[in-house]
A protein has these predicted regions:
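Charge-rich, low-complexity N-terminal segments
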Residues: 1-52
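Charged, low-complexity interaction tracts
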Residues: 39-182
């Protein structure tokens, strides 16, 4: 019975472990109620390469545990926050106009849109000047950090066991100078 550890064996272990890691990270992300649009969750992908594997996620993936620090924001940040408010289903009180519509003036936005833009602007300003609430509170370490460590340990154990079995097999098949098994 020929027993040889192949690259395919190692790739299978790696693929299985990375897929399990992906699932656990998504479950932690959902349990922490961080999902709004689902784009970050949907962006987490496993890619196996010739020499290893990669777990990919969109750019803000790292902020799931750290939050976003204050500072420069992307173009149209208020619009991004506006969409986040909508995706999260946050209720926003409308802001009524004081001025009455007339022939010379028609409101550009509905009261509901005004309330949404006002809230999005306030949130965007707070993040730009102070960072997200998660960042201000020191972050967390339960979304992906412990899961990555578990996965690395599991891969190490499983691949190590494969090679340990291979070495035992080699030892069993070695012969001494007389041609007899040792």
């Amino acid at each position: 019975m020929e027993m040889t550890v192949t690259r395919a064996d190692v790739q299978k272990i790696l693929g299985d472990e990375l897929e399990a890691l992906r699932s656990r990270i998504i479950a932690n992300h959902v349990a922490a109620k961080q999902v709004a649009s689902g784009r970050t969750k949907d962006s987490i992908k496993v890619e196996l390469t010739e020499n290893g594997g990669i777990l990919w996620g969109r750019f803000p993936f790292g902020t799931l545990e750290t939050g976003r620090r204050a500072g420069r924001t992307p173009h149209n940040f208020t619009g991004i926050i506006r969409q986040w408010v909508i995706d999260k289903g946050i209720s926003v009180p409308p802001i009524q106009y004081i001025r009455e519509p007339s022939e010379r003036w028609k409101p550009k936005y509905t009261p509901k849109e005004r309330g949404l833009m006002s809230m999005a602007g306030a949130i965007a300003h707070k993040i730009k000047t102070e960072g997200t609430k998660l960042y201000r509170e020191g972050g967390r370490n339960d979304i992906y950090s412990p899961e990555v460590e578990k996965t690395v340990n599991s891969i190490t154990d499983r691949v190590g066991l494969l090679f340990e079995q291979e070495v035992e097999h080699i030892n069993l098949n070695t012969k001494n100078e007389d041609g007899h098994n040792k």
